[in-house]
Amino acid sequence: MMNLYMYYLMIIMFIFGSIVFISSRKHLLCTLLSLEFMVLMLFMLLFLYLNFMNYESYFSMFFLTFCVCEGVLGLSILVSMIRTHGNDYFQSFSILQC
């Protein structure tokens, strides 16, 4: 019964992260933080599911590896944007320019 409440809590937190991701379109840092929060909630759901079904947790290690790669790519884009433009506002420059 406790696992069911944990599933509902993780799903609600994932939905809140999605709402923040959709509503914060001005700053790249807020967007990246909400994406990482959503990935963390997906990891917790995956971990609870694998423990509940008595599966091995090797897939969660692969999932975390890809999540770290996604985070590093997002931070590298953030650093390059701050170096070239001085801020992380999406409205201060055109994304389509090279």
From Swiss-Prot:
Protein species of origin: Aedes aegypti (Yellowfever mosquito)
Record keyword Mitochondrion present: yes
InterPro entries: NADH_UbQ_OxRdtase_chain4L/K (IPR001133), NUOK/Mnh_C1-like (IPR039428)
UniProt keyword terms in alphabetical order: Electron transport, Membrane, Mitochondrion, NAD, Respiratory chain, Translocase, Transmembrane, Transmembrane helix, Transport, Ubiquinone
Pfam hit, one: Oxidored_q2
Transmembrane segments: 2-22, 28-48, 62-82
Family: Belongs to the complex I subunit 4L family.
Gene3D superfamilies reported for this sequence: 1.10.287.3510
Membrane topology, as annotated: Multi-pass membrane protein
Entry protein name: NADH-ubiquinone oxidoreductase chain 4L
Superkingdom classification of source: Eukaryota
Entry keyword annotation includes Nuclease: no
GO CC list: mitochondrial membrane; NADH dehydrogenase complex
GO process annotations (BP): ATP synthesis coupled electron transport
Reaction(s) catalysed by this chain's protein: a ubiquinone + NADH + 5 H(+)(in) = a ubiquinol + NAD(+) + 4 H(+)(out)
PANTHER family found in the cross-reference section: NADH-UBIQUINONE OXIDOREDUCTASE CHAIN 4L, NADH-UBIQUINONE OXIDOREDUCTASE SUBUNIT ND4L
Compartments where located: Mitochondrion membrane
Top EC category: translocase
GO molecular function: NADH dehydrogenase (ubiquinone) activity
This enzyme's EC code(s): 7.1.1.2
Annotated function: Core subunit of the mitochondrial membrane respiratory chain NADH dehydrogenase (Complex I) that is believed to belong to the minimal assembly required for catalysis. Complex I functions in the transfer of electrons from NADH to the respiratory chain. The immediate electron acceptor for the enzyme is believed to be ubiquinone.
